[in-house]
């Protein structure tokens, strides 16, 4: 008897053993999907991790069916799953759920997309018979038009005797109806007469049009060519290379040359981007060069599209290049040779909720290690502290590109003291006279402007002017955000909505006012100040669909809109030729965040947003509004002094035991009842301190201590580099299991965020 150990798509640790019925033994190998029973009535699609002959010491159920003829999971992918599960302290089931498209975990068989085609009946496929067909419908004008349109589209009208002059072209029913401007009833009438018939064909959901045109790749500038050569030299010695290039230095063009080299060596490339918005712009550039050798993969694609990409990657003709966001790291690669991680510093590479809370950069580096000779290139204008430190220490190769493409100057950054301007009553709401003048001039010159505010919604909150009442979420420990366009107060944590009240429920006053400012409110105010502007807003609310992203970027690129207002989405490497002015409305909101990474993240955000200004022959202008113009980080942004920031922060990190010198693990506890959550967190903290001593901080309330009715407490563990990470995880799991055995804590949830951002 043979047995399989399988992974279930459930948040459960380890694998589960089932027997293989007689007749199926030869069909099952690791990496295949099988249908298995669980409990009395449930069935799941499980992933085979191992096949063996070791009989378990319990009665195990047989698998119901084998769903694959070939493995859906490659050995390298499974090893990546194991590493993510172990390092990020999540179950294999969680990794399975995150990695595979839901269509491959559904008990319903995946249905390929079918298209209905129209064809000429065999009895009419000669010149004489066609005349008969046309005479049959000459009195029915709509049918006559539909038939002649079909004959033209399909090229049956080019008959000479019994043979068409050109090859017959397939015509879909939808195409015929559109071109002939007719209804389905007209086509059906032609079918009923026996002139036409319909048939179905499987069609891919993926855009496979376009041949590769590697000859269209632009030659590199001298600075780019030098960086390219250095990267290749570094990759001979190091598996990971960091390309530190200023904004608009032409890093993407270097990537394209590296991709071409990999393809010529018959290797595959994984190109990761932090935001789906970025894939739209980069996709257009890559598609012109690599055509149908390029595949796109991210969460805004339909599940069916993601299944088709997965299956194509397992075929004998996979994509040579995959361009995608975080989840693309899980795709199968048969001959991976190069991984490019663009904007490697971006926090959106880190998965937050649900588990596994993995970092795509770390996962991609680990994935590359599983292929012989695969290399990783990290690219950014503002490296993460960890990556730059690794490069300085010699763990990674380092290549620097310090000049912008075509010697375009870095933007002029003008720091505006809004505290002083407010005191002198010179501000117009949140806008300084310098900012308004710069935007006005840009619009007058036919140029574009970007305004950055890292908060969506109309206003962060509303408040009663009389008693100070602020509406709070009933499920979470946060105030509700005002969204004026839909006239709702919304919780950005659980999605709870509440109609905007007309009077204060606490004191009855009607004097309710918005406090703070979000992108939606800025859009309204700027429309009043610049009625001639064509304004677009880019935030989470306006980009919920793939088409919304593409439309926003396309409209701004083509000049249909000329003033873009947005959150951090607009900072992430988007290139717009006509942007001459960028306004950072409130630098202080990024700097005042209670987090040890606040200055690092604020510098990155401001430097990246500033980098959107100035393209093609004109120096850009950035208006940076702040109440604290003398802060060192403001000066570092103005002078683009990343090295100064790095040196200053590094000393603090070493002194206070933070990355890159220490690894952090956040331990979270959740429970419906606050007292139980508090008590459990103190007990767990005491247990962990017994093992790790002063490395354990807390328990404490996080900034938001209640989400979706669950109370939250947090412990932080600081682990010096070189400590046995696996031993630490064993201790943590042991402490968790012991605590959950206590009947008082049966409903307690414990989870981990490893290397939190």
Show which residues each predicted segment covers.
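A general secondary-structure junction signal
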Residues: 50-52, 100, 200-202, 453-455, ...
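A carboxyl-terminal module marker
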Residues: 686-711, 750
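Hydrophobic/aromatic-rich, well-ordered segments within soluble, folded domains that form packed cores
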Residues: 33-34, 80-83, 664-665, 669, ...
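Inter-lobe coupling/hinge segments of SF2-like helicase ATPases
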Residues: 215-221, 225, 237-678, 686, ...
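Accessory, non-ATPase domains that flank or precede helicase/AAA+ motor cores in DNA-metabolism machines
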Residues: 1-380, 394-408, 691, 725-757
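Short amphipathic alpha-helical segments
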Residues: 14-16, 172, 663-665, 711-713
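Solvent-exposed, membrane-proximal periplasmic/extracellular interface segments of envelope transport
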Residues: 38, 55-60, 64-67, 702, ...
């Amino acid at each position: 008897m043979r047995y399989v150990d399988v992974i279930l798509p459930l948040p459960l640790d380890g694998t589960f053993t089932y027997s293989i019925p007689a007749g199926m033994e030869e069909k099952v190998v690791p990496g295949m999907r099988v249908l298995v029973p669980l409990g009395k009535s449930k069935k799941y699609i499980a992933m085979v991790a191992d096949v063996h002959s070791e009989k378990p010491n319990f009665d195990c159920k047989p698998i119901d069916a084998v769903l694959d003829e070939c493995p859906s999971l490659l050995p390298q992918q499974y090893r990546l799953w194991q590493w993510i599960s172990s390092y990020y302290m999540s179950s294999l089931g969680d990794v399975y759920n995150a990695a595979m498209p839901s269509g491959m975990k559904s008990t319903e068989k995946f249905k390929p997309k079918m298209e209905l085609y129209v064809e000429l009946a065999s009895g009419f496929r000669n010149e004489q018979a066609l005349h008969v067909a046309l005479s049959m419908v000459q009195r029915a004008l709509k049918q006559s038009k539909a038939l002649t349109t079909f004959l033209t589209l399909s090229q049956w009208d080019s008959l000479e005797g019994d043979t068409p002059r050109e090859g017959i072209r397939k015509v879909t029913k939808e195409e015929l109806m559109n071109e002939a401007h007719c209804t389905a009833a007209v086509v059906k009438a032609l079918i009923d007469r026996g002139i036409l018939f319909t048939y179905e064909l499987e069609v891919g959901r993926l855009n496979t049009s376009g041949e590769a045109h590697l000859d269209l790749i632009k030659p590199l500038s001298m600075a780019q060519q030098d960086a390219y050569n250095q990267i290749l030299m570094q990759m001979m010695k190091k598996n990971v290379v960091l390309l530190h290039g200023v904004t608009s230095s032409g890093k993407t063009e270097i990537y394209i040359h590296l991709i071409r080299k990999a393809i010529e060596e018959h290797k595959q490339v994984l190109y990761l981007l932090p935001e789906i918005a970025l894939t739209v712009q980069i996709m257009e550039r890559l598609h012109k060069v690599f055509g149908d050798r390029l595949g796109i993969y991210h969460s805004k694609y339909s599940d069916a599209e993601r299944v088709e990409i997965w299956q194509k990657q397992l075929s004998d003709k996979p994509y040579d290049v995959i361009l995608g966001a975080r989840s693309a790291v899980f795709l199968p690669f048969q001959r991976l040779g190069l991984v490019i991680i663009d904007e490697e510093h971006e926090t959106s590479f880190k998965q937050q909720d649900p588990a596994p809370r993995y970092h795509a950069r770390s996962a991609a580096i680990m994935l590359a290690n599983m292929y012989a000779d695969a290399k990783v290139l990290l690219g950014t204008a503002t490296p993460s502290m960890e990556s730059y430190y690794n490069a300085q220490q010699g763990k990674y190769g380092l290549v620097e590109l310090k000049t912008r493409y075509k010697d375009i100057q870095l933007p002029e950054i003008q720091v505006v003291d809004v505290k002083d301007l407010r005191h002198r009553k010179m501000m117009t709401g949140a806008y300084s006279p310098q900012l308004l003048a710069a935007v006005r001039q840009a619009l007058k010159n036919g140029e574009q402007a970007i305004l950055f505010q890292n908060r969506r919604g109309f206003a962060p909150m509303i408040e009663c002017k009389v008693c100070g009442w602020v509406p709070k979420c009933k499920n979470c420990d946060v105030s509700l955000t005002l969204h004026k366009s839909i006239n709702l107060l919304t919780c950005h944590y659980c999605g709870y909505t509440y109609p905007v009240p007309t009077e204060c429920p606490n004191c009855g006053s009607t004097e309710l006012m918005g406090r703070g400012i979000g992108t939606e409110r800025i859009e309204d105010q700027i429309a009043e100040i610049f009625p001639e502007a064509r304004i677009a807003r880019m935030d989470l609310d306006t980009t919920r669909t793939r088409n919304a992203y593409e439309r926003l970027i396309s409209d701004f690129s083509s000049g249909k809109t000329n003033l873009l207002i947005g959150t951090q989405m607009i900072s992430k490497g988007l290139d717009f030729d006509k942007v001459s002015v960028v306004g950072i409305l409130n630098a202080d909101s990024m700097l005042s965040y209670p987090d040890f990474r606040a200055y690092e993240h604020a510098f990155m955000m401001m430097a990246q947003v500033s980098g959107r200004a100035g393209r093609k022959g004109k120096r850009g202008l950035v208006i940076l509004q702040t109440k604290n113009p003398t802060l060192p980080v403001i000066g570092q942004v103005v002078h683009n002094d990343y090295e100064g920031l790095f040196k200053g922060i590094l000393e603090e990190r070493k002194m206070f035991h933070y990355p890159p010198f220490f690894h952090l693990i956040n331990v979270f506890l959740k429970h419906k009842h606050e007292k139980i959550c508090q008590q459990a967190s103190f007990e767990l903290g005491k247990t962990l301190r017994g093992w790790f001593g002063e490395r354990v901080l807390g328990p404490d309330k996080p900034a938001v201590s209640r989400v979706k009715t669950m109370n939250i407490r947090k412990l932080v563990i600081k682990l010096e580099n070189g400590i046995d990470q696996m031993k630490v995880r064993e201790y943590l799991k042991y402490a968790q299991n012991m605590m959950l055995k206590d009947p008082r804590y049966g409903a307690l949830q414990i989870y981990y965020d490893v290397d939190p951002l």
